[in-house]
Amino acid sequence: MVAEHLTIRNLTSTPITLKRIERFHAPEKPRDVDIGALAKNFTRLVTNVTRAEAPVASITDDTKPFQHKDVDIHVEPFKTVRTELRSYIDSDKERIRWFFESKGERHQIQTPVPTTETASMKPLSKDAKLRFTGIFTPAESHLAIFSSANLNAWMRELKDDTLLSSLSIPGTHNSPTCHVAPPSVRCQAVSPREQLKNGVRFFDIRVQPKFPNDKDKDELALVHSTFPISLTGDKYFRDLEREVIDFLEHNPSETLIISLKREGPGTHTDEQLSRIIRDHYARPGSRWYTDPKIPTLGEARGKIVLVRRFNILEELKEIHGGRGWGINATGWADNCANATCPSGQIIIQDFYEVMETQNINKKIQYVTNHCKRASETCYPFGILPGPKATKAHPFYINFLSASNFFKLGTWPEKIAEKVNPATVDYLCRKHGEKEGADWSTGILVTDWVGLDGDWDLARAIVGFNAKLMVRQVKQDNNERK
């Protein structure tokens, strides 16, 4: 059932006016067989991917609408307007081309979008400065409009005094598990490098020390629980770190939070892992940020921010003036809907035991509840002195991932198939209600993001930094007066 009327939500800092809509009948004849699409479907079979959506035909510029209507529907920043425009005239398969105006510029989008690329609105004005992205929810006839960000370097739009925990950040769960592997082990559709290019700024990494007793060895195998992440042989953290550093060198405005946890078979300890990271990775002068306080963007740009889910050597507790080493995420509550790490710097939702498919709705509710908690924050700008000060301004880390290794319907990609679209829908239609808050999403940690080029979830998360940026501009203007 499709909602009766069209709804527009403006999640940008710019007033937007709908000026015209054009309606088009759905294509009458099926598309020609696409050999590329068939190949892609075959690839899904051999890489454990089960979600597949047929592409929608594009409306060409010379296609004539069967109906059009000139309107003047104004939508203020961060407001929603439920219009009197009907969702469809003859069939709920109809297409719509929308024409918007903002600051004298005209922009166009068609819905449903034919490809992921056309989620970006098409500027119709010469030398247009504004860029918009639209995410359409067909069942609700709802169009959410975001300011388009260059996902490759979206943090450069934010000022140095922005606290990292105040940001809306896309993340991935078991980030490097994109290789051919058992379906209960694989969690990602694309490589870490591709994730970084598309806005992901939080990696969840699990490692196994291969030679824990040899101080000269730095090998850390990438694992998921007790399993290697690839059937073709061990993959190593050193190679992943090189990719991250290369990305940061080319995008110095960005930072990456890495949550690191020890897993895998063998006799090794957290303390041994902490020594390996200190001696071989996070050395003085390296790109690692190991201060135990939550940094501002200015402190973290170009760096890897360590969030450690492991205990450390006693000598590391004396670093940074006796304040410790790395943002402390030890004491991470298991399988929780809402819990705070003992350090006070991280509040988590990490309910993962979805034993039956009907429990997926419970997981979705936990995700949206944690989003709401994050949305009600309003953190200060500027550098905070230490871990105790940052307790009042924690990270909200929200895992969309869950699985049951022993049940086909609850393998990671099956969970993501339902949780990811539900989260996009929630963000676009419902997230952000409290006045005076920043509407942050916190860090949303996902499985299978970017499948078939679908980055709507990352776009929506990054887009929710707009309200924070507006508050920052207002504060700067007030300080100048």
Residue ranges and their predicted role:
Residues L151-M355:
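Chitinase-like catalytic core of GlcNAc-active glycosidases
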Residues V2-N198, F211-H250, I312-E314, S403-K481:
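Long, acidic (Asp/Glu-rich), low-complexity accessory segments flanking structured domains
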Residues I258, P284-E299, F399-L400, T446, ...:
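A generic structural motif
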